[in-house]
A protein has these predicted regions:
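Aromatic "clamp/platform" in nucleotide-sugar-dependent glycosyltransferases that forms part
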Residues: 262, 281
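Carbohydrate-associated surface elements
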Residues: 154, 176
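Nucleotide-activated donor-binding/catalytic signature segment of Leloir-type glycosyltransferases, i.e.
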Residues: 245-261
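Conserved acidic donor-binding segment of nucleotide-sugar-dependent glycosyltransferases
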Residues: 313-314, 318-325, 334-339
Length: 375
C-alpha cells in the first residue's frame, strides 16, 4: 500500500506514535509519505520507502492567522495525485481530518477517491475538540472518516460521550513499543553513573504542560529522597518547567534534580530509571509510561484516563488518586526499599509491555484496518 501520514511533528505522544508507525509500515514493504509542516522529530534523515513532504503555509498580510488547514489540504491533494496514495492516515483530528476531508472532496471532482483513517490521540477530543469553537467541525470530520481509531477504551468512551458519533464505529488500537529498542540489557549503564551511581533514579518524561502536574513529580521525589537517597531526571520542556525548577529550589532538592530538556531518543535514559513518575490529571493513553514499563521501570502514576489500561496497579506499578503526593511517595519508597519487590515488578512490567503492546502486533492491526477501509 501507499500510505500518507499526517501528524504534529513536534515533541509529543501522537507525533511519536505516527512516526514509529510509518517507519514500521515501511519496514513491512509499504510506501509511506509524511505530509506535515516540519520533519517529525523521530524521523531519521533517510529511510527506504519513507518520504517527507513539507507543507508550505503562505503568509500574506491579509491573513492574521496563516490557514494551515487549507495549505495542508492542498499538499495532501498534491501528494495523493503524484504518488498514487491508497489512503491518508490522520493522527489527531484537528485540523488533519478536516484537511483530509477537503482533499477527498477535491479528488471527487476529478472522479477519484482517497480513503481517510483518523486516529484519535487525546486532547484532540478531550480539550480542543470540546472547545465550542471546534466542537462541530471535530464531530463532522471524524464522522466523515472512512475508519476511526482511538488509542484507549477511555478515549473511545470519551469520544462517544462528547460527540455521539452515531454515524461511525471507533476501534481501539493502542500505542506500541519496539521491544528491541526498549530493552534494558542493550544499554551499559553509563548514563546511570552520570546521575549518581549510588542513588536510585526517578524519571519523568513529558511536555511539561499543566495536565502533567510536574510540580507533583518534584514533591513526590522530595519525599522519596528523605527515605531513599535518589536523583530525579526530568526529560522534556514546556510552560511549567520554571515552576518545577522553583519547586525544587524551595524544597531544597534542586541539586538532585536534573532537567535535561527535550531528547528524541529516550530509551537509553529509561534503561537507567528505577521508577517512572507520572502524576497527570489525565492521560488518554500514557505512551511515556508504556516506554518506561518496556524498559523495566515500574510506574508510579494516577488513576486517570487511560493510564489504568497501561499500568497494572500493584503488578507493574502503583496508581493513586490525582494529587495524592503522599500516596505516590509512600508507594515509591515501599518499592525502592524492597529489592525483591522491585525486581518482580520490573520483570512483570517489561514482560507485560511486550505481551500487550508489541510493535508487530499493533502495526498488524492497523494494516487490517487499512485493508478493511479499502475493501
Amino acid at each position: 500500500m501507499n500510505v500518507g501520514i499526517t501528524c504534529y511533528p513536534t515533541y509529543g505522544g501522537s507525533g511519536a506514535v505516527a512516526t514509529e508507525l510509518g517507519i514500521a509500515l515501511a519496514q513491512r514493504g509499504h510506501e509511506v509519505h509524511f505530509v506535515t509542516y516540519k520533519q517529525p522529530f523521530r524521523l531519521p534523515t533517510f529511510l527506504p520507502r519513507v518520504f517527507f513532504h513539507e507543507v508550505d503555509v503562505g503568509r500574506y498580510p491579509l491573513f492574521e492567522f496563516p490557514p494551515y488547514d487549507l495549505a495542508l489540504a492542498v499538499r495532501m491533494h498534491e501528494v495523493v495525485r503524484e504518488h498514487k496514495l491508497d489512503l491518508l492516515h490522520c493522527h489527531y483530528a484537528i485540523p488533519h481530518a478536516t484537511s483530509a476531508w477537503i482533499t477527498k472532496q477535491m479528488l471527487k471532482e476529478e472522479k477519484r477517491d482517497i480513503k481517510v483513517v483518523t486516529t484519535l490521540h487525546g486532547t484532540d477530543i478531550t480539550i480542543v475538540g470540546q472547545d465550542p469553537s471546534f466542537h462541530s467541525i471535530t464531530k463532522f470530520s471524524i464522522e466523515k472518516s472512512d475508519a476511526l481509531t482511538a488509542v484507549s477504551r477511555y478515549l473511545q468512551n470519551e469520544t462517544l460521550s462528547a460527540f455521539g458519533c452515531t454515524a461511525c464505529r471507533i476501534d481501539v488500537i493502542p500505542n506500541f513499543i519496539d521491544p528491541k529498542v526498549y530493552d534494558r540489557a542493550r544499554y551499559d549503564g553509563q548514563l546511570r553513573a552520570q546521575f549518581d551511581g549510588n542513588s536510585k533514579v526517578l524519571m519523568h518524561i513529558s511536555n511539561f504542560r499543566p495536565v502533567k502536574r510536574i510540580r507533583d513529580v518534584v514533591r513526590v521525589f522530595a519525599a522519596v529522597n528523605q527515605a531513599v537517597p535518589s536523583v530525579l531526571v526530568m526529560v522534556g520542556d514546556g510552560p511549567d518547567r520554571g515552576d518545577a525548577e522553583k519547586e525544587a529550589r524551595e524544597l531544597g532538592v534542586d541539586k538532585r534534580v536534573h532537567f535535561l530538556g527535550k531528547i528524541d531518543s529516550v530509551a537509553p535514559l529509561l534503561a537507567a530509571a528505577d521508577l517512572f513518575v507520572l502524576p497527570s490529571n489525565s492521560e488518554s493513553f500514557g505512551l511515556s509510561a508504556l516506554e518506561a514499563l518496556a524498559s523495566g521501570a515500574p510506574v508510579i502514576g494516577t488513576k486517570a484516563g487511560g493510564l489504568p489500561e497501561v499500568v497494572r496497579d500493584g503488578e507493574t506499578g502503583v496508581l493513586c488518586p490525582v494529587g495524592d503526593v503522599e500516596g505516590m511517595a509512600h508507594a515509591a519508597i515501599a518499592i525502592l526499599q524492597d529489592a525483591d519487590r522491585w525486581q518482580t515488578m520490573s520483570r512483570r512490567a517489561a514482560a507485560d509491555a511486550r505481551e500487550r503492546f508489541a510493535m508487530d502486533d499493533i502495526v498488524e492491526q492497523y494494516e487490517d484496518m487499512y485493508k478493511h477501509a479499502l475493501a
